[in-house]
Regions:
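Short, surface-exposed charged micro-motifs
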Residues: 326, 676, 683
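Short Gly/Ser/Thr- and Asp/Glu-enriched loop/turn motifs at secondary-structure junctions
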Residues: 331-332, 679-683
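Short cationic amphipathic helices and targeting signals
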Residues: 337, 682-686
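Short, contiguous acidic/charged loop-to-helix segments that flank catalytic cores in large enzymes
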Residues: 648-657, 685
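Active-site palm subdomain of RNA-directed nucleic acid polymerases
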Residues: 658-680
Length: 743
């Protein structure tokens, strides 16, 4: 690989030197100015090679890939590509990046291709031939660029910029001063504590997965033929076009058959037309959902296989190494790793393949927490803690028997429906095997996770001081049962409202709980009725209930509407908070001078923002290997999309609060000496000896944040003088007694 890379770099460097020598006098393109302003042509060649591999492997559009390459090239030249208006900067970056990619076209390695996506066209890079040096190098890389792998060394965040990245993704220039270490020291502490965590690959699990893949085990995503995927994508585009016709016909039927009845009820022509459009949209959406179910399943299966291959290949590349992950923040303050796929917030496979470099020796506490983690992975996370431990020890003989032959274990196969944890379960089973083999010499490297109970509802219950919501999400102990269950509260709300349809009301409580889980979470992130209807249909096969798997879209629409109404009425204060946030952001926009950027502070010191701007389309002329190429791009204009602001504020506020909770929990744990973290927004993992410390610190941090009026402070920051939400009488100090706030 090194020989091929070096040969390619020599060729690209030679081509760039040739282009520099051939630059004429007079006006020059942005890329030619980059060449004249650099003394590191070799560095430019490396960027061009790595970004080409990255763009082709990800299927990135040419404008996006070109802009990304140019941003990196700008660091190696005295010519500033980022000088001028936003539109001029966009022109310069795209044209410079595209012309740079053209150097590989001149070497007969790549070309620009146009891919149709419905009515849209996407320009991308692809190989001219699969019989050339660049393609062979690409194959050796197996689509993983060196840019995408975890790093063996960690560089601390000390300023808002590091290694060419900003601490906040898409950081507005006007807010740069808000993200200094002085303004948010505990956020920096959290980022660096997480980033300095030492990870290694779970070698035992990786070997098991490779054997399972070879044996075509049911846990492993199947390989889908590329022609099948192409056919499925074509079908999706065809069905999308036909669905528009279905909607038009539905509207005609509605107006012909229903409009007279509505007119007799006193509705105006405008109101009737509005209803006909809504009916048309629902019919078109339902037809499209049902017709596209099979091709979508095929595309999703292909994506799962693609992800599995990426994760396992990256894990093989990192074998026998100690490595770190670098993190950036999003606009809410949530942490996201720079690396994709094989990373701590990724899929079940990725999480299972990651273990801490620094383990802890066996103790009663380690075994207790390993048992809880194992039970959680087995889907028994609603049992009391002691019962989870007992459950695992009762099944220990089966666990150890399965560990001897995981690829052929009937016991293990019963967990095939545990979409989120089956590979982490295998990792836990392997730990029990090691413990029983090694005894007192056993050292546990497995991250042990405690999950929040519906984090969004927890946050909204805390900020509105709602006792019922806090009990049902385990923010405080439940007075009548061991563990609160908000999803069953929603299910009972639906059934108590007189729901009766297709005998679904006869389903057991477990099925109803599954039906209500995702819609409940989505509702508090401001999902509307239509979204919840679609989720109900999309998830119909995931519940393990035959009658639900046979749902039509009309069935799902009826059930989804009932669930939406049930959620809305079950926790009224939380719904009030959503509406208050919408009123607040509307007030902020009225007083914002026509600007799109809206900000608020969180308890961590982070300045959260949402910036839903209007979009304009522009065109830029580029040179690609001497030929003129015209490309389209999108440019955000600093004028607000008010409807998007209104839709987004509930989710963004809640996520900003859980982000502050995560950051401060990590920072507080680091101060107490914890050195290994594996955190995922509302899932908190440390080593098996420190979960009790994690729980206590989490509760202390929760109180620290929510004893202040986070909702009221945010509404006042938006300019809303009166808080319309009627708070409950939750005593936030009761959180310290909570046993299951994370479990």
């Amino acid at each position: 690989m090194e020989n091929r890379r070096e040969t390619l770099l020599l060729q690209i460097t030679g081509q760039l030197n040739h282009m520099t020598a051939a630059i004429p006098r007079g006006p020059k393109s942005a890329f030619r100015k980059v060449l004249l302003g650099t003394d590191n042509v070799r560095g430019l060649a490396e960027l061009i090679l790595d970004h080409t591999i990255k763009a082709i492997s990800k299927g990135t559009g040419l404008t996006t890939a070109g802009e990304g390459l140019a941003i990196e090239m700008n660091k190696l030249t005295t010519f500033n590509l980022k000088s001028g208006t936003d539109r001029k900067v966009k022109y310069a970056l795209i044209s410079a990046g595209v012309e740079a990619f053209g150097s590989l076209k001149s070497l007969s390695y790549i070309d620009k291709v146009t891919e149709r996506q419905g009515v849209m066209k996407l320009n991308k890079l692809d190989f001219i031939s699969e019989d050339n040096l660049l393609f062979y190098y690409f194959e050796e890389q197996l689509t993983i660029s060196e840019l995408e792998l975890p790093k063996e060394d960690y560089t601390y965040w000390t300023h808002p910029r590091k290694d060419g990245r900003t601490i906040v993704k898409k950081m507005p220039k006007s807010l740069t001063s808000q993200y200094t270490h002085t303004k948010m020291p505990r956020v920096y502490a959290a980022l660096n504590a997480y980033g300095s965590t030492k990870f290694k690959v779970n070698e035992e699990l990786l070997s098991v997965l490779m054997q399972m893949d070879e044996d075509k085990h049911m846990f492993i995503p199947k390989t889908i033929d590329s022609e099948e995927v192409s056919g499925a994508l074509y079908s999706l585009m065809k069905f999308r076009r036909i669905s528009e016709f279905v909607g038009e016909q539905a509207k005609k039927w509605y107006l012909a058959n229903v409009s007279q009845q509505l007119m007799k009820k006193g509705l105006t022509t405008v109101q009737i037309d509005g209803r006909s459009k809504k009916y048309s949209k629902r019919k078109a959406s339902g037809w499209f959902k049902e017709k596209t179910s099979e091709p979508l399943d095929l595309v999703r299966a292909s994506s799962k296989r693609y992800e599995f291959d990426k994760v396992t290949f990256m894990a093989r590349r990192m074998r026998n190494k100690t490595f770190h992950y670098d993190f950036q923040l999003d606009s809410r303050g949530r942490m996201y790793p720079v690396v994709n796929y094989f990373e701590p917030t990724g899929s079940d496979v990725a999480k299972g393949l990651l273990i801490f470099k620094n383990g802890v020796p066996v103790s009663d506490n380690v075994l207790y927490n390993l048992a809880i983690h194992t039970a959680n992975c087995m889907g028994e996370d609603k049992l009391a803690m002691e019962d989870r431990v007992l459950f695992v020890w009762v099944h220990m003989d089966e666990i150890l028997e399965a560990a001897e032959n995981l690829t052929n274990s009937e016991w293990l196969n019963q967990f095939k429906s545990e979409k989120k944890t089956k590979f982490q379960l295998i990792a836990a089973v392997l730990e029990w095997k090691k413990y029983h083999e090694q005894g007192e010499d056993y050292v546990c490297h497995l991250p042990i996770g405690l999950d929040a109970t519906n984090s969004g509802l927890q946050v909204l219950s805390a900020v509105t001081r709602d006792v019922i919501g806090a009990q049902e999400t385990n923010v405080i102990n439940h007075p009548d049962q061991e563990i609160g269950d908000a999803y069953m509260v929603i299910a009972n709300s639906v059934l108590d409202n007189g729901f009766a349809y297709n005998n679904y009301e006869e389903l057991d409580s477990k099925a109803w709980r599954k039906l209500c889980k995702r819609p409940t979470m989505s509702y508090y992130y401001d999902a509307g009725r239509e979204c919840i209807q679609e989720q109900t249909y999309d998830d119909r096969r995931d519940h393990g209930v035959d009658v639900l798997s046979r749902m039509t879209f009309d069935d799902a629409s009826y059930v989804g509407t009932a669930i939406y109404d049930g959620v809305e009425s079950a926790f009224p204060r939380q719904t009030q908070a959503k509406e208050a946030l919408k009123a607040g952001v509307e007030e902020a926009l009225r007083n914002n001078g026509g600007k799109a950027l809206v900000t608020w502070k969180t308890a961590s010191g982070f300045t959260a923002f949402q910036d839903y701007s209007r979009i304009e389309t522009g065109r830029v002329n580029c040179s690609f290997a001497g030929k003129l190429v015209q490309l389209s791009f999108q440019l955000f204009i600093d004028k607000p999309m008010k409807s998007d602001h209104s839709k987004g504020i509930s989710a963004n506020f809640v996520h900003s609060q859980d982000a502050a909770l995560l950051s401060l929990t990590i920072a507080n744990l680091a101060e107490k000496g914890v050195k290994s973290f594996m955190m995922i927004h509302d899932q908190f993992s440390v080593n098996a000896e420190e979960t009790s410390l994690l729980l206590e610190t989490f509760k202390e941090t929760f109180i620290e944040i929510f004893e202040e009026d986070q909702l009221g402070d945010t509404l006042r920051a938006f300019g809303l003088q009166t808080n319309p939400v009627g708070y409950g009488d939750l005593d936030i100090q009761d959180v310290m007694e909570a046993k299951y706030i994370i479990s």
